[in-house]
């Protein structure tokens, strides 16, 4: 399966798998901005941005992708950043639809208790490709069939098996 990729900036790094059987392609930082500056053009002299506890930033990768119908790309966190620094994705997974051809952005949030510097070329997320069922149609009904679970919501099936 082939996915087309385009550099939107000459310094953008093409995502790569780190091992042969890795599910995700690592996404690299081209630059990063605070949310209110998301529409700014790419910064030519970007080196790093400091993300403080509770703060969020938009990482721009400088790449765009084009997939075939029936696919989506998911932007997912990297476990090492989450474990060591409390850095994760605010909207995880982020969805890149098959018809979106703009910059593949990454919304990072610092859930840790210390600031973290996000530098140009850092690997901050991974891109995983998944099938999508576009032929699904929603059909409104007055009632739904009975199931064993019914409308039991969060925590309804229990937390652990201890008495």
Swiss-Prot record:
Keyword check for Hydrolase: yes
Catalytic activity as recorded in UniProt: dUTP + H2O = dUMP + diphosphate + H(+)
Biochemical pathway: Pyrimidine metabolism; dUMP biosynthesis; dUMP from dCTP (dUTP route): step 2/2
UniProt binding sites for substrate: 78-80, 91, 95-97
Gene Ontology biological-process annotations: dUMP biosynthetic process; dUTP catabolic process
Region (Disordered): 140-163
Any one GO molecular function term: dUTP diphosphatase activity
Keyword check for Magnesium: yes
Keyword terms, alphabetized: Hydrolase, Magnesium, Metal-binding, Nucleotide metabolism
Source species, domain of life: Bacteria
Protein name in UniProt: Deoxyuridine 5'-triphosphate nucleotidohydrolase
């Amino acid at each position: 399966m082939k996915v087309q990729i385009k550099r939107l900036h000459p310094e953008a790094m093409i995502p790569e798998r780190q091992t042969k059987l890795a599910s995700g392609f690592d996404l690299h930082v081209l630059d990063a901005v605070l949310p209110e500056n998301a529409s700014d053009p790419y910064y030519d002299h970007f080196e790093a941005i400091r993300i403080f506890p509770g703060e969020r930033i938009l990482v721009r990768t400088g790449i765009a992708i084009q997939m075939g119908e029936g696919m989506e790309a998911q932007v997912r966190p990297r476990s090492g950043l989450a474990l060591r620094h409390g850095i994760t994705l605010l909207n995880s997974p982020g969805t890149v639809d098959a018809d979106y051809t703009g910059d593949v952005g990454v919304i990072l949030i610092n859930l840790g208790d210390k600031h973290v510097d996000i530098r140009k070329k850092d690997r901050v997320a991974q891109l995983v490709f998944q099938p999508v069922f576009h032929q699904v149609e929603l059909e409104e009904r007055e009632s739904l069939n009975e199931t064993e679970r019914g409308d039991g919501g969060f925590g309804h099936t229990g937390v652990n098996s201890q008495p």
